[in-house]
């Protein structure tokens, strides 16, 4: 391992069983870098967790304003994220692919990751969120903002040496397709949630606080 400034340059065994296009794509993105882009990539990644928590805020706001559509959109988005990340982490430990910085020479490593590489949970979760929101609210500015954000998250994972391009592509597909399927079967899925998960949230204007009632999973 070689420390270069704020980055880590890992030396690993030169041989790898990964497809050549995957390795070449990773190297091209990872090694075409600059300090300013490093900073942007780091900042962009820090938005992932708060953005993934967005459905909670949307649901609470929908409860406060009695906006049923917003609450439904929040439930669909949260469901897409949960199903996507569950599937992704199951795949990670079935495939058990090593992170590129652990098995390739000369990969710049920005950040850290302990779980297996394939597929990318960041890309999957980001596109589950972005796709779900754009399907529920198909306004141009929402589509552009959400998809640019998700693309930045996905690209950044390769740039930072955390993933091969195929990790990100498959993660993107899993996240986007899960959100699309849930949107396509929206009515059935929301009925399923209402039947199996007794959750009621009301907003009391006088006390200016949220009251959570009957938060009981009834599976």
Which residues are covered by each model-predicted region?
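Small-polar-interrupted transmembrane alpha-helices in polytopic inner-membrane proteins
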Residues: 79-93, 144-156
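Interfacial segments of alpha-helical transmembrane regions
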Residues: 62-84
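Membrane-embedded catalytic cores of phosphoryl/pyrophosphoryl-handling enzymes
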Residues: 105-217
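Membrane-helix interface segments
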Residues: 36, 68-72, 138-142
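Short helix-capping/hinge motifs at transmembrane helix termini and TM-loop junctions
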Residues: 64-66, 95-96, 138, 161
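N-terminal transmembrane-helix/juxtamembrane module of multi-pass inner/ER membrane proteins
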Residues: 2-57, 89-115
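Membrane-water interface at transmembrane helix exits
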Residues: 58-62, 88-96, 134, 182-187
């Amino acid at each position: 391992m070689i420390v270069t400034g704020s980055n880590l340059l890992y030396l690993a065994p030169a041989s790898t069983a990964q497809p050549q296009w995957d390795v070449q794509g990773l190297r091209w993105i990872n090694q075409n870098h600059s300090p300013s882009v490093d900073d942007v990539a780091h900042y962009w990644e820090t938005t992932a967790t708060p953005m993934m928590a967005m459905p909670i805020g949307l649901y609470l706001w929908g409860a406060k304003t009695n906006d049923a559509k917003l609450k439904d959109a929040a439930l669909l988005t949260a469901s897409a994220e949960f199903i996507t990340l569950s599937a992704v982490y199951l795949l990670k430990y079935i495939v058990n692919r090593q992170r590129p910085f652990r098995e390739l020479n000369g990969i710049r490593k920005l950040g850290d990751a302990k779980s297996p590489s394939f597929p990318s949970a960041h890309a999957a979760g980001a596109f589950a969120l972005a796709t779900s929101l754009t399907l529920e609210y198909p306004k141009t500015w929402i589509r552009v903002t959400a998809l640019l954000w998700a693309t930045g998250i996905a690209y950044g994972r390769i740039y930072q040496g955390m993933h091969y391009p195929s990790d990100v592509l498959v993660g993107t597909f899993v996240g986007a397709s899960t959100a699309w399927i849930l949107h396509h079967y929206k009515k059935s899925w929301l009925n399923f949630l209402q039947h199996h998960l007794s959750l009621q949230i009301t907003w009391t204007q006088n006390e200016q606080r949220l009251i959570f009632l009957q938060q009981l999973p009834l599976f």
